[in-house]
């Protein structure tokens, strides 16, 4: 096998079969590619420097014409791609995506789109890897509740700040990270924003609040001062925040997030390989009712202001 790994991303694009009757379930979008004469799920190669999420949303929009609300991660599919006589490994990152608006227009690359029930989609898909991915989607409910657990952005050094620590603001790097988080987190269409009552936490989500016109509510239980002794309250808050099928953003601190994640994943018997919590990073937590189904880590956005 020669050549480097091809990175790609895509989505299982779904919508309710009947918006007024949830019991009728969902249907998914399957596309036909005339070049290969196959039926597949929408996906494509990442552009240079493009993140997996940005690439997935761009490719789904380009191939289907639909804007989406990002849902839970569906993991990777891996296979070998033959290109010009060279075999190269290909890794595709996938997300569940709810169609929110759009219209399909045929192109040279995709000449047909069908909205079909899950069983029919499984029979129609040409590649085994796509069928396996659809099975992953089916194993979890489509309309899940999402909590985006964000660590505050860069705020300089605690030792260099002469005022009360809870008043320490974001630095230039932190403001750049906060601005970039708007683009990332807006893909999930948050309907509620909660922050620890520390200035650097509220400032981290202020740009998102302005862009989404969603107010920021503070809750001291997510702060390093309010969390000790109230751990059970914080876990309970995570389980109910955002409503039955909404998306909430919670901005917290590095002394809180690892322990909070460990408590809720242990309680729901979900194993994490590691619990990272870098400044401006995000954990995407997906729930069915109040039970945690998945936890996926998104590293901090890369911004020039933080390169020095």
Predicted segments, located by residue:
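Active-site-adjacent alpha-helix immediately C-terminal to a catalytic or transition-state-stabilizing loop
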Residues: 235-293
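Non-catalytic terminal regions with compositionally biased, polar/charged low complexity
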Residues: 126-132, 136, 262, 266, ...
């Amino acid at each position: 096998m020669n050549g480097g790994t091809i990175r790609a991303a895509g989505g299982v694009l779904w919508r309710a079969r009947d918006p007024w009757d949830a019991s009728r379930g969902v249907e998914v979008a399957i596309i036909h590619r005339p070049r290969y004469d196959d039926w597949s799920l929408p996906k494509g190669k990442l552009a240079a420097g493009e993140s997996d999420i940005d690439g997935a949303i761009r490719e789904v929009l380009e191939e289907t014409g639909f804007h989406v609300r990002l849902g839970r991660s569906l993991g990777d599919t891996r296979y070998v791609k033959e290109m010009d006589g060279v075999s190269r490994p290909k890794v595709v990152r996938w997300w569940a995506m709810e169609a929110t608006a759009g219209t399909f227009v045929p192109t040279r690359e995709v000449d047909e789109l069908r909205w079909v029930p899950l069983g029919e989609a499984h029979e129609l898909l040409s590649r085994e890897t796509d069928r396996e991915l659809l099975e992953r989607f089916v194993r979890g409910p489509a309309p899940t509740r999402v909590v985006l657990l964000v660590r505050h952005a860069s705020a300089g050094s605690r030792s260099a700040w002469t005022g009360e620590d809870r008043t320490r603001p974001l630095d230039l790097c932190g403001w750049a990270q906060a601005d970039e988080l708007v683009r990332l987190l807006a893909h999930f269409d948050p309907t509620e924003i909660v922050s620890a009552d520390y200035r650097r936490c509220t400032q981290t989500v202020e740009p998102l609040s302005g862009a989404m016109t969603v107010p920021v509510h503070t809750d001291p239980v997510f702060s390093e001062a309010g969390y000790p002794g109230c751990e059970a309250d914080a876990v309970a808050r995570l389980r109910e925040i955002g409503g039955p099928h909404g998306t909430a953003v919670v901005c917290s601190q590095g002394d809180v997030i690892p322990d909070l994640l460990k408590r809720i994943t242990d309680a729901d018997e979900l194993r994490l390989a590691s619990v990272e919590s870098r400044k401006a990073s995000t954990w995407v937590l997906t729930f069915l009712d109040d039970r945690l189904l998945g936890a996926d880590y998104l590293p901090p956005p890369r911004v020039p202001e933080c390169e020095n």
